[in-house]
Amino acid sequence: MVTKQPICPDRIRRTPRQFSWLDHRLVSDHYIDRCTHAAAALYLFLVTVADARGMSYYSARTLAQRLVMDEYTLIRTRDELVDIGLIAYRKPLYQVLAIDVEPIGQTGTLQSVEQIFKHLGEGRQ
């Protein structure tokens, strides 16, 4: 096992006042594998600017400018993140969503009616 020592000990990250985070399950549950580069960039931006509840609001024009993409690409990219289950969007609000225990559509197993109703009761689809 590799012993991890900081390469730049004087620059160890500290939790900032406006703390945001990326859930490790983004990688371990393969959500990131389902994202285009544009979607990963938009997700990183939204996670960075979100408040404690994952909420933010930026206009399509501003996001497109900040991410150097046209508005059509931004809309397609936003829809991609919604379909994957990483964000919710209702103009003008974005919400970075909690990552499900199992990625949506990745179980490959049948669900009982009880499981489906349980998920619906938790606000999942």
Question: What positions do the PLM features span?
Answer:
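Short, structured secondary-structure boundary patches
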Residues: 19, 28, 78, 93-97, ...
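Short recognition helix of helix-turn-helix/winged-helix DNA-binding domains
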Residues: 1-54
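Intrinsically disordered, low-complexity N-terminal regions enriched in serine/proline/glycine
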Residues: 30, 42, 57, 88, ...
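Short, amphipathic alpha-helical interaction segments positioned at domain boundaries
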Residues: 102-125
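Charged/polar, solvent-exposed surface patches and flexible loops
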Residues: 24, 33, 65, 76, ...
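Generic low-complexity, intrinsically disordered sequence content enriched
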Residues: 26, 46, 67, 85, ...
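Winged helix-turn-helix DNA-binding recognition segment
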Residues: 37, 49-102
